[in-house]
Amino acid sequence: MEHYFTNNESLESKIKEINYNILDKNFTFYTDLGVFSKDKVDYGTDLLLKTYLNNRSESLKVLDVGCGYGVIGLVLESTTNSKVDMIDINKRSVHLTKMNIKRLKSNNNAFYSDAYSEVKDTYDVIITNPPIRVGNDKLLEILIGAKKHLNEKGELWYVIRKDQGGLTIMKKLQDTYNIEIKDKKKGYLIFCAKSK
């Protein structure tokens, strides 16, 4: 079985459009086979965005890690006027994100990166709905690795379900970050982590 965090060049392409509404704004995104949550914006991403936007409304420099087809970055640009770099290990996801950037006349940037391998900048916020199925080592690389790409008072925002180890992962990050649970609904936990 193929996962959305791998690249399968031979996977058939069936690009389609999905609609998403948040804060009375409507978005239409291109999606395709082989990307995360291709049929609709998943609940975790939706809750992460709503919680973030309830807490932060200013224009910031943001990195969206594991951007999928670009939902988080494009919504944040539209709602907060933030400048967002969007990265993914899945080349099809990066291609779709670039299509959605063009469609929405966005100034955001999307590029391939294995975790932070191609990231050269620092950010006010790093935000992610991380790929849980990559395993603990890669997941911790994404979450702990964010620290060196955060500005001095930067924040890492992420979502993990409680039954997927959200609280266990939080404990593993407590040497690196001061972490606060900003919201919890339907088993999903929204975390905001600030560097110690």
For each feature predicted by the language model, list its residue ranges.
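Conserved SAM-binding loop and adjacent beta-strand
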Residues: 32-50
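A short glycine-rich, Lys/Arg-flanked "PGG" loop and its adjoining helix->strand segment in the class I
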Residues: 140-152
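Conserved beta-strand signature within the Rossmann-like core of class I S-adenosyl-L-methionine
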Residues: 153-161
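Conserved class I S-adenosyl-L-methionine
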Residues: 161-177
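Conserved SAM/SAH cofactor-binding pocket of Class I
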Residues: 44-128
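N-terminal auxiliary segments of SAM/dcSAM-dependent transferases
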Residues: 1-23, 34-37
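Short beta->alpha hinge that forms the Motif I/post-I loop of the SAM-binding pocket
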Residues: 88-92, 138, 161
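Core SAM-dependent methyltransferase catalytic element
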Residues: 183-196
